[in-house]
Amino acid sequence: MNQQYPSVLLEKAVGEFSKLPGIGRKTAMRLVLHLLRQDTATVEAFGNSIITLKREVKYCKVCHNISDTETCQICANPQRDASTVCVVENIRDVMAVEATQQYRGLYHVLGGVISPMDGVGPSDLQIESLVQRVSEGGIKEVILALSTTMEGDTTNFYIYRKLEKMGVKLSVIARGISVGDELEYADEITLGRSIVNRTLFTGTV
């Protein structure tokens, strides 16, 4: 046991919390001590919610968004514009775009971006399923709404090359978002305008 901790159990709990992104050991300690001050029922409810989430959450068979059912609420909504698909990096980006209330189409969640430095290639992402969706017909426009980073631009270009001869309009969100920014950190007004003012993708990185 590390002499810094009075309990092995405390040390293990802090260690697990500190594995979460953005959580250092000091913050992990505060969270663990907070839980220790709660009653048993509250802590059990917290733990069970995470276990249940991991065991039972589904990914939409159409767009790969998180869902409680086989098809997510967005894809199942007949009032959404099924002819337009917005391609995003992750589920947080879906939530960010939805918060703008400026988009009524569907989504396609890639699960990341192409990043050779991190060992992420096209086959690790949901790119082929996007190609399959487009090939099935009905989609008129694909909006590329990835982060304005080198990896995001590389992924945009790769998708463009896969779809350029499939008869769909390929557009990209306007560069109201600063280069290097991730979509989820853009404010709602800026992101909303970037979607509304999207431009034709020309295939340049």
From Swiss-Prot:
Zinc finger (C4-type) boundaries: 60-75
Gene3D superfamilies xrefs: 3.30.60.80, 3.40.1360.10, 6.10.250.240, RecR Domain 1
SMART domains named among the record's database cross-references: TOPRIM
Any one GO MF annotation of this record: zinc ion binding
GO biological process: double-strand break repair; recombinational repair
PROSITE patterns (alphabetical): RECR, TOPRIM
Pfam families: RecR_C (PF21175), RecR_HhH (PF21176), RecR_ZnF (PF02132), Toprim_4 (PF13662)
Listed SUPFAM superfamilies: Recombination protein RecR
Stretches assigned to the Toprim domain: 83-178
Keywords assigned by UniProt, alphabetized: DNA damage, DNA recombination, DNA repair, Metal-binding, Zinc, Zinc-finger
Role this protein plays: May play a role in DNA repair. It seems to be involved in an RecBC-independent recombinational process of DNA repair. It may act with RecF and RecO.
Family statement: Belongs to the RecR family.
NCBIfam families reported for this sequence: recR (TIGR00615)
Protein's UniProt name: Recombination protein RecR
Native species: Bacteroides thetaiotaomicron (strain ATCC 29148 / DSM 2079 / JCM 5827 / CCUG 10774 / NCTC 10582 / VPI-5482 / E50)
